[in-house]
Amino acid sequence: MAEALTVAAIAIKAFFSAYLLFAAAHKLVDQARFEQTLEDYQLLPPWALAPAAKLLPYIEVLIVLLIVWPATAATGLLLCTGLMTVYLLAMMSTLLRHIQLQDCGCGGIGAQATVGRWHLMRNAAFVLLSVVGATLSGFTQSISLAGVITGALVGGIFTLLCLSLEGLHSNDRILQGILSHE
């Protein structure tokens, strides 16, 4: 049982490491677009947009570094929980104010999808998953190489699954348009 919990912790750490690195890379590659996305949320004063657009990707990378270092993994996952909660609250605030966002700023794949319930559910699930990961980090014990590989593979597969679901969600509107013309 303890080894299964350790494998689950590794999978969660692998998932958030990959997901946050992907999100940070997206933000760093096109900082102007990310700054525009932050402006679209209408939560920050104009003077804070550029610094936030520059700082957030590095915060995500720092969290990844904390997650992958065993001694700081729980701290990294708790910081991840905080970051995911902030992102969730920002989306909720925007939706409650009836502001339509075309891009949540998360990672580029969902750029064609208007931010809505899907994004709220996804981020709520990420908040819960990061709490579980932080909790499981306390149960981590010595594990075989096979267990480490299994955890990393499960985390990678989960990352690909999430990115695929993002792609399907963003293409749903496009597919509906194609199907309605047949």
Describe the predicted segments one by one.
Residues 2-182:
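Membrane-interfacial helix-loop segments of redox and metal-homeostasis proteins
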